[in-house]
Amino acid sequence: MRQILLFAALAASLALLSGCTLSKAKADTAEDMADKAAYHKVSAEEAYEMMASQEVVVVDVRTREEYDGGHIENAVLVPNESIGSEMPEALPDKEATLLVYCRSGRRSKDAAQKLLALGYQSVYDFGGVIDWPYELVKEG
């Protein structure tokens, strides 16, 4: 009887220890993902350099009217208000490098954080178009 109790205690201890190890491994993986998908704030100049040197998706999170009034060339319009609990259709690749901007920087920060929460891995906020010293394109 004593051997059975000892064996049961040993088995329970092993089960608890292995459960803790698995939980820690899962937590470490979640932390690694969070580190990879961190919020990045960059200047307009840094964003411009990124556009020139690598493949990026420029995301304008202003309204349609603001976008039509002048936007960065090749920018994709994804209004901040439209970013919810589902991945925006205009941004199908969660691994793409996204450069997010708005008018002043408030909406771009909010949008960048929402995109990170949706699982996008490489999101850079470069603030507002009011600080963009380069050319804008107008629709029409």
Set out the residue ranges of the language-model regions:
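Structural scaffold elements adjacent to functional motifs in cytosolic proteins
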Residues: V58-D60
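Short, glycine/acidic-enriched loop or turn micro-motifs at the edges of active sites
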Residues: T63
